[in-house]
Amino acid sequence: MFDKLQAAEDRYEEISHKLSDPDVINNQDEYKKYMKECSDLEEIVQKYREYTKVTKEIEEARELLEQTLDKDFREMVQQEFQEAQEKLEVIKRQLKILIVPKDPNDDKNVIVEIRGGAGGEEAALFAGVLFRAMAKYAEKKRWKYEILDSNPTELGGFKEVVFTIEGKGAYSRLKFESGVHRVQRVPSTESSGRIHTSTITVAVLPEVEEVDVDINPSDLRIDTYRASGAGGQHINKTDSAIRITHMPTGIVVSCQDERSQHKNKDKAMKILRSKLYEIAQEQQINEVAQDRKNQVGTGDRSERIRTYNYPQGRVTDHRINLTLYKLEQVLDGDLDELIDALITTDQSEKLGSGSDDEG
């Protein structure tokens, strides 16, 4: 591990010198590239320097303790020695996490798809509840969200809703929401008070740039139609809604939330790019995958990841066996406790799988 940390510090020093080179400063593309690399390395290098400083303090304290000292001074040095050792253990743990390879998509914006599954109108209603929870979470993080496409129901739910969330690190925190979410509650229409179980599926995709995915225009079939609202009534008198079919894969995306056909097409292409990128990523992962499944989950949309039980006020994440009796707060957008626990487990898994390499 320490060879990697020293190499990171050496590279950081090298880049810092390059950033003061007039030739680099005058080349904006090169300058931006080095600035990004410098920013990516900064946290781990600062933490490694802190580790080196504390290690030196421990050595100095140890040397003093080997000398003949008066009682009061020895006690003071002994206390400093113990505190420095405890601090060093904390820094070591932080460094282990920082050295875990970062998901290249972590800083990206996301496209989220929520679809009602088993349970009819109840599933559609909960799709709306979960959409609002994620929208509130985005607001708490000061991220921006925008609906790209939706199929609302008359009772205020969604058969399907597709939206973007824009903000630094959005994918790093929301990627764990992909999968099947199960809700257990008594529907308002249920006179006997019987609990119903419904499911919805969530897919979280990193938003990708045009340069990340090559799409041949001849592979696309583009259809226009009139946008419709809840219950199917037409809300626009022109054919502004767009449906794009990517013929090689059969992927179909649509967007009807803008009045402009051009804007709807741009948004639909944004969704398509992310879907094609996801397929390419999955193929790449499968090629290098080990014969194990992460405890946090594969991100498979068919995997049941979480249950929301209204009568008990309970939320259970099945991937990490975490239960919180904070249903109301979670659905009000307080997702950090769940997400932090998932990230911690994911990092521990990655550290465990990489421990053999550290020899």
From Swiss-Prot:
One MF term in the entry's GO annotations: translation release factor activity, codon specific
Localization per record: Cytoplasm
KW Cytoplasm (keyword) present: yes
Residues recorded with modification N5-methylglutamine: Q233
Pfam families according to UniProt: PCRF, RF-1
Matching Gene3D superfamilies: 3.30.160.20, 3.30.70.1660, 6.10.140.1950
Post-translational modification: Methylated by PrmC. Methylation increases the termination efficiency of RF1.
SUPFAM superfamilies: Release factor (SSF75620)
Domain of life, source organism: Bacteria
Family: Belongs to the prokaryotic/mitochondrial release factor family.
General function of this protein: Peptide chain release factor 1 directs the termination of translation in response to the peptide chain termination codons UAG and UAA.
Descriptive protein name: Peptide chain release factor 1
Organism listed in the record: Ruminiclostridium cellulolyticum (strain ATCC 35319 / DSM 5812 / JCM 6584 / H10)
